[in-house]
């Protein structure tokens, strides 16, 4: 199969040295999904590709690709870089985890659909200074569908009731209303935590405004999401361990 030279738009979210002077990098792209590229000579100080392979660089990347395996980074233009991420440990830890999580939800060259914008909007919101914990919880909850384990959050799993007091049941695969609290095992969340999880899972991230959520409530919803992931996805990501160390949990 002949290789094509084409431009892809997106963000470089991971890189590692390959051999003596080359770099392997992962791109989150609108056109092709996740793509691993090799930047030949990218480690050399005078490399023309050095600027394009810094972590969390946004832009247009010219790649030589066969739509499988490793593509080759050839050119770049319209780069946008965020130097503050090199010194802001919190932002860096959150972003590294979210893209690592998304990287495990999709195969390479799989179209991302709306998830492309989900991660890009999350990236830009965190860079701009919005609460990274709330942004992270939105992404975590909405990626469950990409993993094939989307919970039912719009209404009670058992009876379909949409309003009232709810709790989350991992066994039932979603929220249950108070009429059925004794019927299934549940997480025994506070009504506020369940309401927050439902809101974050169903809210388009582009519509998220400036909101103030108490630390205790955020911690409760974070623990619940961790339990959901452990029971349904069961990933053990070093990036999550690092994030937990950074945020002290």
Swiss-Prot record:
Output the Pfam families linked to this UniProt entry. Answer: RecO_C, RecO_N
Q: InterPro entries given for it?
A: ARFGAP/RecO, DNA_rep/recomb_RecO_N, NA-bd_OB-fold, RecO, RecO_C
User: Organism's domain of life?
Assistant: Bacteria
Q: Does the keyword DNA damage apply?
A: yes
Sorted keywords for this record are: DNA damage, DNA recombination, DNA repair
What GO biological process terms are annotated to this protein in UniProt?
Answer: DNA recombination; double-strand break repair
Which terms in the GO cellular component ontology are assigned? Answer: bacterial nucleoid
Give the similarity note.
Answer: Belongs to the RecO family.
Q: Its biological function?
A: Involved in DNA repair and RecF pathway recombination.
Q: What is this protein called?
A: DNA repair protein RecO
Instruction: Say which species the protein is native to.
Output: Lactobacillus delbrueckii subsp. bulgaricus (strain ATCC 11842 / DSM 20081 / BCRC 10696 / JCM 1002 / NBRC 13953 / NCIMB 11778 / NCTC 12712 / WDCM 00102 / Lb 14)
> Highest lineage ranks of the organism?
Bacteria, Bacillati, Bacillota, Bacilli, Lactobacillales
């Amino acid at each position: 199969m002949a290789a094509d030279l084409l431009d892809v738009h997106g963000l470089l979210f991971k890189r590692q040295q390959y051999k003596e002077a080359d770099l392997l990098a992962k791109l989150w792209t609108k056109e092709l999904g996740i793509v691993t590229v090799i930047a030949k000579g990218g480690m050399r100080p005078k490399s023309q590709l050095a600027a394009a392979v810094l972590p969390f660089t946004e832009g247009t990347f010219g790649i030589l690709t066969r739509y499988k395996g490793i593509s080759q980074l050839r050119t770049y233009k319209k780069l946008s870089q965020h130097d503050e991420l090199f010194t802001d440990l919190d932002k860096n830890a959150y972003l590294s985890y979210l893209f690592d999580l998304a990287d495990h939800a999709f195969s390479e060259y799989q179209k991302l659909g709306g998830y492309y914008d989900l991660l890009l909007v999350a990236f830009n919101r965190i860079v701009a200074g919005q609460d990274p914990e709330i942004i992270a919880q939105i992404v975590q909850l909405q990626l469950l569908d990409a993993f094939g384990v989307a919970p039912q959050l719009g209404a009670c799993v058992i009876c379909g009731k949409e309003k009232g007091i709810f709790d989350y049941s991992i066994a039932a695969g979603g929220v249950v209303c108070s009429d059925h609290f004794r019927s299934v095992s549940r997480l025994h969340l506070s009504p506020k935590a369940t309401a927050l999880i439902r809101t974050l899972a169903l809210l388009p991230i582009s519509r998220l405004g400036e909101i103030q959520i108490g630390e205790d409530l955020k911690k409760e919803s974070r623990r619940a999401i961790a339990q959901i992931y452990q029971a349904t996805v069961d990933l053990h990501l070093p990036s999550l361990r690092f994030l937990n160390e950074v945020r002290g949990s």
